[in-house]
Amino acid sequence: MTVYNINLGIGWASSGVEYAQAYRAKIFREMGQEAKFVFMDLILGDNIEHMTSKIGFSDDEIIWLHNYFTDIKIAPSTISLAEIETILPANPERKEVAGRLIRYHYPQDDMVVACNLRAMDEDAVETVSYFVNDKLLRKDFYSYTRYCSEYSAPKDNQAKVYQRRFYNEDGSTAYDMIVGDNNQDIYRFPDQVLYGKQEFLRYFFKR
């Protein structure tokens, strides 16, 4: 039997609730009781693994709702800058380093690609953002592979996300999330379409 613990989100400044859950995970481990800790929020500000491992969860104890429908494991960001450079457009005119942010400039295409490292003293890349004419068009999220892409379009002088794509390990699309207003997102799977977060949650709990 597996014990499932349902949570909403997690952040770097975790509340007592998350620490209590991590303590509960430790107790379950000592008892030999299998347990999973489910996080329901869309968590893309940072790789969820970096936050859950920081307070004591094991990676195999974590289920993240939006990752659950893929075959990508919960894991730290380990893909290197050198690996990312192999998939970027060739021959940038200039490479600019500013702390954790590495920018590649392609003025011939009015494009800048910005790689955000996990930490100042690490080579692991967390996100890669693509700007054209100073407008954010796409942002890719990485652990040991790309697990999500976020597509944006300019609106009211800001980048408005209109679609998120979640991937499998082989790079194929697991499902698309079409971003709507008032939490009316559409989740498009190969075999069905779900309308709104409530249908998405029901589909998850049926699995």
Stretches found by the model and what they are:
Residues 86-198:
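Repetitive, compositionally biased segments used for assembly/scaffolding
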